């Protein structure tokens, strides 16, 4: 992926310098896990019940957009179960032996966390099925005619799988999770709480309005909120007395080109192109990609999802259309109905 996409300030994927920072502010207990009230309440019940029965927790699948706390929740599950945690990711497990090495080193009730579980090799999945259902591992010893299969008993353990693409999981794998949790984008009050908690851990002085300004521009995502907090902290230390209030946060985020709705330069460029070059749309994806000099995949996978989710653009069979919200955001007059109809007719002829 393009380097500028990977280092996008409001990108939800983790950047190379962030793992240690995220670990330092990650909550360890379910009671400290902010937001996701339904998920938190359900997991509290499931964990208490399993603990009281002295059993391993059922296997857990956590899915949702990046940056919402899937890894954090996996760590909390292990901590609350007073169990060890082994962590890996789907792409890292290249052969059956890699998975076998992890499984045979688990202690009773341990948690095995597999991030990006939708990217597991199908051959690895086949090894995983009996381990999940029967806590047994089938291993092939030898090669050719002399090869034989032996079964190893595994201690009861909990698999926690995390994915941003639940639809890519195979049905047999998905069906083996007893607990499935979907993480939603966060509300502003929860993000304010998250920003204030991170500020306290990082020894940053911030008031309620300053936290609110950061939260509103964080696209409903804690990872982005914490990243913006660190950048605003830099600004406050250099340009002010180190304290973050509403005006300091606003000035810093404006300087960073993150507007009040969390849109950055790439978002605004795409929206303004639809409005100014294509009269609000509809515009085909290939034409749009050429107009803003971006790859089609970048638009579809990186830029568009948040804009569609927030209602800035509509994706129709005829192409992308800027909504009324987009015109309001840029303080531009709405196009007439006749202009929109002409655009539809023109695109239909081109296609």
UniProtKB/Swiss-Prot annotation:
It catalyses: ATP + H2O = ADP + phosphate + H(+). Signal peptide: none annotated. Residues 260-351 are annotated as: Head domain (RuvB-H). One of its GO terms (cellular component) is Holliday junction resolvase complex. SUPFAM superfamilies: P-loop containing nucleoside triphosphate hydrolases, Winged helix' DNA-binding domain. Its EC number is 3.6.4.-. DNA binds at residues 296, 315, 320. Residues 1-186 are annotated as: Large ATPase domain (RuvB-L). Mg(2+) binds at residue 71. Residues 187-257 are annotated as: Small ATPAse domain (RuvB-S). SMART domains: AAA (SM00382). It is found in: Cytoplasm. Gene3D superfamilies: 1.10.8.60, P-loop containing nucleotide triphosphate hydrolases, Winged helix-like DNA-binding domain superfamily/Winged helix DNA-binding domain. The keyword ATP-binding applies. HAMAP family: DNA_HJ_migration_RuvB. Homohexamer. Forms an RuvA(8)-RuvB(12)-Holliday junction (HJ) complex. HJ DNA is sandwiched between 2 RuvA tetramers; dsDNA enters through RuvA and exits via RuvB. An RuvB hexamer assembles on each DNA strand where it exits the tetramer. Each RuvB hexamer is contacted by two RuvA subunits (via domain III) on 2 adjacent RuvB subunits; this complex drives branch migration. In the full resolvosome a probable DNA-RuvA(4)-RuvB(12)-RuvC(2) complex forms which resolves the HJ. Belongs to the RuvB family. Has 3 domains, the large (RuvB-L) and small ATPase (RuvB-S) domains and the C-terminal head (RuvB-H) domain. The head domain binds DNA, while the ATPase domains jointly bind ATP, ADP or are empty depending on the state of the subunit in the translocation cycle. During a single DNA translocation step the structure of each domain remains the same, but their relative positions change. This is Holliday junction branch migration complex subunit RuvB. The gene is ruvB.
